[in-house]
Curated annotation (Swiss-Prot):
The modification Pyruvic acid (Ser) is found at residue 25. This is Aspartate 1-decarboxylase. The keyword Lyase applies. Catalyzes the pyruvoyl-dependent decarboxylation of aspartate to produce beta-alanine. Substrate binds at residues 57, 73-75.
Length: 127
């Protein structure tokens, strides 16, 4: 049996753009992608902390160091510039792999620079 587990998480990203006329996806600063082991075209789930919306799309890498977090196409309808979002990727693991899997988690500051890297997520973690 395979289990779907969180593989990477970008916590408290601030939306910098929402481009309704783009074909689709989310553009993410490629330096952030590297830190959480996310790849171009990888499926991600996005949770908007401001309005509760949850959407799925795929990644387009943005300019490294730019701090860009841009929701494109239909996904742009679910955010406004300045909204705080959580972006998560998932992987499929055997039960044995899942028991030892350690996801990569980064917390961003208000300018989308990596503020901290969390080695794990504990119950009742608040930032």
């Amino acid at each position: 049996m395979f289990r779907t587990m969180m593989n990477g998480k970008i916590h408290r990203a601030t939306v910098t753009e929402a481009n309704l006329n783009y074909v689709g996806s989310i553009t993410i600063d490629s330096a952030i992608l590297e830190a959480v082991d996310m790849l171009p075209n990888e499926k991600v789930q996005i949770v908007n902390n401001n309005n509760g919306a949850r959407i799925e799309t795929y990644i387009i890498p943005g300019e490294p160091g730019s701090g860009v977090i841009c929701l494109n196409g239909a996904a742009a309808r679910h955010v406004q510039v300045g909204d705080v979002v959580i972006i998560m990727s998932y992987g499929m693991f055997t039960t044995e792999e899942a028991k030892t899997h350690e996801p990569k988690i980064v917390v961003l500051d208000e300018k989308n620079h990596i503020e901290m890297i969390l080695p794990e997520e504990k119950a009742h973690t608040t930032l």
